[in-house]
């Protein structure tokens, strides 16, 4: 990250959110707000199921723990550490799983009538985002491995053809990898998209498996 964007001295041995939660737990605050299990006191069945260590730090957003809507302390530091670890300019912690992240990504880029190039086997969150923003999908049909019976990634030739036929598309979206672990040539696709003045979006929800 650039120096003007980084507020904290980055130390990858730190775990800012965990550390803040642990400090808050040790304060033994008596809760009068949400969640209703009151750090386990109000729901012994839930505590027995999840464990005291878990419910003891399941607390409401408050100043010592920062606020995800406008992070300025521990969440902001965690985001900067994540960006540094990933080699990215910025990182944003999300709630709602990768579905909300993918939808946010598409809605940030596309508006009504915009074309976006994407594989036919995208996650439904992408399709939901297109419905919400009114963008027009330009589908690339991935080939199928007949022996394994699974769909593959987008080929460079397929993406190149789609870009030439739809030069006004605003972005190319790639599953990296697919739900079966198949990766497209992401580096080549990114270059093709950028050379055409398009953004390249990557759904990497299954990339950690």
Regions found by a protein language model. Give the residues of each.
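Active-site phosphate-binding strand-loop segment of PLP-dependent enzymes
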Residues: 148-209
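N-terminal "arm"/small-domain region of PLP-dependent enzymes with the aminotransferase-like
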Residues: 1-73
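Short glycine/serine/threonine/alanine-rich loop segments
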Residues: 88, 135, 198
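Conserved beta-loop-alpha segment that forms the PLP phosphate-binding cup at the N-terminus of a helix
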Residues: 90-116, 129
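Conserved N-terminal alpha-helix of the aminotransferase class I/II PLP-enzyme fold
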Residues: 52-100
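Gly/Ser/Thr-rich loops at beta-strand to alpha-helix junctions
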Residues: 75, 96-101, 122-124, 178-182, ...
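PLP-dependent aminotransferase-like
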Residues: 114-174
């Amino acid at each position: 990250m650039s120096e003007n964007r980084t507020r904290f001295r980055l130390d990858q041995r730190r775990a800012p959110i965990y550390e803040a939660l642990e400090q808050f737990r040790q304060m033994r605050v008596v809760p009068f707000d949400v969640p209703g299990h009151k750090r386990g006191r109000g729901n012994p069945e839930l505590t027995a199921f999840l464990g005291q260590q878990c419910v003891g730090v399941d607390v409401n957003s408050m100043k010592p723990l920062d606020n995800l809507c406008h992070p300025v302390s521990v969440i902001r530091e965690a985001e900067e550490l994540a960006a540094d670890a990933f080699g990215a300019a910025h990182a944003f912690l999300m709630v709602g799983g990768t579905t909300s992240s993918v939808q946010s990504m598409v809605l940030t880029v596309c508006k009504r009538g915009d074309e976006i190039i994407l594989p036919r086997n995208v996650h439904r969150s992408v399709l939901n985002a297109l419905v919400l923003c009114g963008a027009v999908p330009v589908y690339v049909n991935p080939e199928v491995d007949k022996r394994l019976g699974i769909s593959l990634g987008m080929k460079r030739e397929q993406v190149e053809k789609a870009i030439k036929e739809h030069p006004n598309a605003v972005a190319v979206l790639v599953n990296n990898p697919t739900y079966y672990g198949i990766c497209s040539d992401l580096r080549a696709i990114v270059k093709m998209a950028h050379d055409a003045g398009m953004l390249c979006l990557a759904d990497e929800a299954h990339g950690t498996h």
